[in-house]
Amino acid sequence: MQVRNKDDILICEAIENYDSESLRNILENGADPNVRVPYQYSHLHNAIEKKNGSAVSLLLKHGADPNISGFFTPPLHKAIKKGCVDIARSLLEYGAIVNLEHYCLKPIHIAANRTESKIVKLLIEYGADINSEDGANGKYPIHYAMKVYDPFRLKIIKVLLDHGADINKQSVLTNTSPLYETRFITDDLLDYIISRGANINIKGRMGRNILHEIILRNGYNDFSNILVLIDHGADINALDDEGNTPFMLHTINNNAIILANYIVSLYYLSYKARISNGMEKNMKIINKCEYLSSCINIIKEEIERMKTFKIYDGNSFQDLSLFDLLSNEDNIAIVYRLSDTLLEKMNIIKTIFPNCFRIIQNILKMLTKRYEMLLEINNIMNANLVNTKWYTLPIEIRWMILTKLDDMILRNLLLQNETNNIKNCKKQ
């Protein structure tokens, strides 16, 4: 760092030597803390670079501008990049602009893309706009949080969501969901964001869902991401604006066979999927392609075996087959009741039905989770609507009404109830 006069030299030396006493004396004797040296680099920038919190505090106390930037990054942006929570707090206390944009990014965008949730909390405390767009792609802080591949990313995502960030907010320019930013999609990430209201089948540009986008991206580790998404309910049969399903965009290779197995299994086990236009198109491709069509007979054989594979817990459902259980969503309560029996038989099921195992697992998981949500909402409504017409309805009718709601609505109702409970607790 080049300097121009004796005071600048002494200030630089004091900062770099972490000599707070000398720095205090120099500043009290009238040295200018805002002197810009070549390239508009300031003493405040130098102190932040050295992570010298004492020097930052002294410079600010003696009049250093917390928003000084010039050619370089504003001090608050720099402190966030360096991971200095205490320095960032000092800057904010002395008037750093919390929503100042620099090269298209505000402090909250940078903080969300780091591994330190404390800085995100600090910025929110000082009024950061958690739903502000960046100046380049119109991405939001939640998009930047999703980019982080780190065990701590869930903490950052939680902080943002707890303070009102929209998990389904799509970027302005590319019209993609926050989930698209993630290069490593994991079970724990999907479980969490879905529980917080994420719609993983939301459509963006050209009517594409997350599977369309990831298949077109065709990047490193993307097939693993595709499988994790499918396991959590991403729709392989969804049609985009051009009439393409995600499967239609996938290269014909070994991975496509895995997807074909899944699609054919879904065809035989799910009536809703079977009658969709996307499924019809996917099945046409599989039937016409010699490389893929061999999986149809393999899946058919496993489906026939499912029809004779009895699920019996020793007490009831003696004549119920695995196929009957999976192919009828009305059996949701039975799935829940037999969950322990099914868990015990899972290794046997995997051995007998290797090609259908993924869809078997997913249907059981989906039905179990759905039943748990229905039970919870049923209990909430019964507790809160005692003196209403709802409570006068027969139990069977109440249950039938609730089962007409899709999973997304059920999750949103539970989230709303949780939010209301938190608000009521705060009032008390």
UniProtKB/Swiss-Prot annotation:
Gene3D superfamilies named among the record's database cross-references: Ankyrin repeat-containing domain
InterPro entries per record: Ankyrin_rpt (IPR002110), Ankyrin_rpt-contain_sf (IPR036770), PRANC_domain (IPR018272)
UniProtKB keywords: ANK repeat, Repeat
PANTHER family: ANKYRIN REPEAT DOMAIN-CONTAINING PROTEIN 39-RELATED (PTHR24171)
ANK repeats: 6-35, 39-68, 71-100, 103-132, 137-169, 174-202, 206-238, 242-271
Protein name as catalogued: Putative ankyrin repeat protein FPV234
Stored PROSITE patterns: ANK_REP_REGION (PS50297), ANK_REPEAT (PS50088)
Coiled coil: none
Domain of life, per lineage: Viruses
